[in-house]
Amino acid sequence: MSLFNKVTKTFQWGQHTVTLETGEISRQAGGAVIVNIDDTVVLATVVGAKNAKPGQDFFPLTVDYIEKTYAAGKIPGSFFKREAKPSELEVLTSRLIDRPLRPLFPEGFYNEVHVVVHVLSLNPEASADIAALIGSSAALAISGIPFNGPVGAARVGYVNGEYVLNPGPTQLKSSKMDLVVAGTEAAVLMVESEADQLTEEVMLGAVVYGHEQAKVAIAAINELVRDAGKPAWDWQPPARNEPLIAKVAEFGLAKIEAAYQIRNKQARTHACRAAYAEVKISLAEAGVVFDNVDVDNLLFELEAKTVRGQILQGEPRIDGRDTRTVRPIEIRTGVLPRTHGSALFTRGETQALVVATLGTDQDSQRIDALAGDFRDSFLFHYNMPPFATGEVGRMGTTKRRETGHGRLAKRALVPLLPPKDEFGYTIRVVSEITESNGSSSMASVCGGCLAMMDAGVPMKAHVAGIAMGLIKEGNRFAVLTDILGDEDHLGDMDFKVAGTTAGVTALQMDIKIQGITKEIMQVALAQAKEARLHILGKMVEAMGTANTEVSNFAPRLYTMKINPEKIRDVIGKGGSVIRALTEETGCQIDIGEDGTITIASTDADKAELAKKRIADITAEAEIGKVYEGPVVKILDFGALINILPGKDGLLHISQIAHQRVEKVTDFLTEGQVVKVKVLETDEKGRIKLSMKALIERPEGMEFEERAPRREGGFGDRGDRGDRGPRRDRGGDRPERGERPARAEQPATEESGAPAAGQPQQQQGQQQ
């Protein structure tokens, strides 16, 4: 009999085969499900604490998505050779899972819940995030933990005018959209998308299409729960203390209503805190026994009731606006004198100081992703310190919220960036939130666009973002434009849309309630477009076009193309050549595999010097061309002359002078600069040089240099030069006696042939 009670459900989902399995692995977890989508395998587990911690006043849900490098057949590249802190992708995927799950836990459930997802195997063409979300939902559904799920999810692409279900990374390259939608069978709860300026109608259609496809996964999870689900927890929400509710309303309602008549955020916040304290004092004086957490929750309910009621009754919002008005906008560019580009974007009480910096390819970020390494040349970082909301807090590592907001702003801007071959810079944008009262991520989009234009980045169009909210009670609802922080907390939806005049580039939606219909989303998108166009108008007024020149403090990029086979010459042994070039010119030099060289420098003269040096290094010796260079080495049979950087040619002893050369050192010394002519090159790159080709032949020298003609010698053969004693050239040889006079030789010898029995003359002339 098997140890395991394994339950498996398999279904076809578009082009993918999906398997849900439980009962074999992680049996001691509250719920554990293995999800396999075309060989991408994830293990999703969930554990819930049986009791809430005393004094707990919020729902402590933690989601950890963890990619194991062995899933892709890799060993971690770190010094410790094991997985370390979460990557940005892991953080973003953890948030992606958290957002649709959190609203489905019942009100008042404060038990700690921990969802952990491990990626165990990865098919690069089947992304793990959708499998992780489905697995987390399934694990919660079978665990028995109070949960109003399950949740389904799907990715939607848009290729050739048609929606595509769960496209892989390769297919996404040709897609104009990457949208993830998650929700229950009844309603959409979360949307995360980037798009290439698509219309609101296309975006809404993708949400509806994705939700329909997600229902396929929900049906499979329900089947798994039917066969493998654990008993539901015996949990009931705490009974409402009606006498306490009445007393809190009696002492607090008027104070809360008065506080929400204050338009200034800081003053309103102070008034609310004072109201909380005064209510507790009044309760104590009245002899009411209460728990601070219970009173705080009841007062928060009064805040929500006050704000929501005012809006649904058509009264002004918290800051006095109607539902469609955008807060006043102030824009200033070129704020910081020595940065490459900067902008200060202020909308009401939300303000972003955004700075753009230009760098080279060496400044791009290397991403060691599970699906494969790549380099990212557009970086967007979002920071929100505690002082932005007038609070005291701890500064430290980047929080998940900051990572998520930065990625949303980046998604909004990427489609409008110039192509890399037109603008070769690495771009880093940093948004410093200096004030926050709602929609700081969308302020970062606006400020980021303006900062890059100030830096001289030729953006295709202006990009703006707006955050929308929703108040819904029964059949009544109101969509709010440009929501405040309080409206976000007290409302039912946070809906962020970014784009241009042509269409949407990013969309993020988080819904806290069920029952959001297609019609409501349609109204929200239309109202968001109206607000976006208003903000774009303000941005165009402040900065109509990008600066045509980059900042004086930014590096200029100069490009040149070389033969890829010459790359090794530019780099040199162990990087010696390029290192010397960098030190000499002060330029940053990047070399592409295709032979494209990018030189970055703030000094044009130094950049030109670097270009000349590289051109010299990669130049080919031209036959017949004259070069000047130093003698780098003396050889017995000639000398090596450096005619180009890294290129030496052979000057043979026979090509030094017209007359006979006995010793190379009689004519040349190491370090001497000489002019030479290239005679020929071979397929191995060897170069033959000549000095004598540049020297006029001495008078009386009719042919190549030869030894002087001996009296009575071999006919009239011209002056052959002083050949010196033969013994010196031929080594020790026996004396041969005195030669007979040339005139006494037979006439046939005059043609140059030796007499009978006479040894052949050695060919001593230089070749």
Swiss-Prot record:
Cellular component GO terms, alphabetical: cytosol
Keywords: Cytoplasm, Magnesium, Metal-binding, Nucleotidyltransferase, RNA-binding, Transferase
Any GO MF annotation of the entry: magnesium ion binding
Catalysed reaction equations from the record: RNA(n+1) + phosphate = RNA(n) + a ribonucleoside 5'-diphosphate
GO biological process, one term: RNA processing
Swiss-Prot/TrEMBL cofactor(s): Mg(2+)
Binding of Mg(2+), residues: 488, 494
SUPFAM superfamilies cross-referenced by the UniProt entry: Eukaryotic type KH-domain (KH-domain type I), Nucleic acid-binding proteins, Polynucleotide phosphorylase/guanosine pentaphosphate synthase (PNPase/GPSI), domain 3, Ribonuclease PH domain 2-like, Ribosomal protein S5 domain 2-like
Any Pfam family hit: KH_1
Region (Disordered): 700-767
EC number: 2.7.7.8
Domain KH: 555-614
Bias (Low complexity): 752-767
InterPro entries for the chain: ExoRNase_PH_dom1, ExoRNase_PH_dom2, ExoRNase_PH_dom2_sf, KH_dom, KH_dom_type_1, KH_dom_type_1_sf, NA-bd_OB-fold, PNPase
Bias (Basic and acidic residues) ranges: 700-742
Annotated ranges, domain S1 motif: 624-692
Localization per Swiss-Prot or TrEMBL: Cytoplasm
UniProt keyword Transcription, yes or no: no
Domain of life: Bacteria
Family the UniProt entry places it in: Belongs to the polyribonucleotide nucleotidyltransferase family.
Function: Involved in mRNA degradation. Catalyzes the phosphorolysis of single-stranded polyribonucleotides processively in the 3'- to 5'-direction.
The name this protein goes by in its record: Polyribonucleotide nucleotidyltransferase
Organism: Leptothrix cholodnii (strain ATCC 51168 / LMG 8142 / SP-6)
Lineage: Bacteria, Pseudomonadati, Pseudomonadota, Betaproteobacteria, Burkholderiales
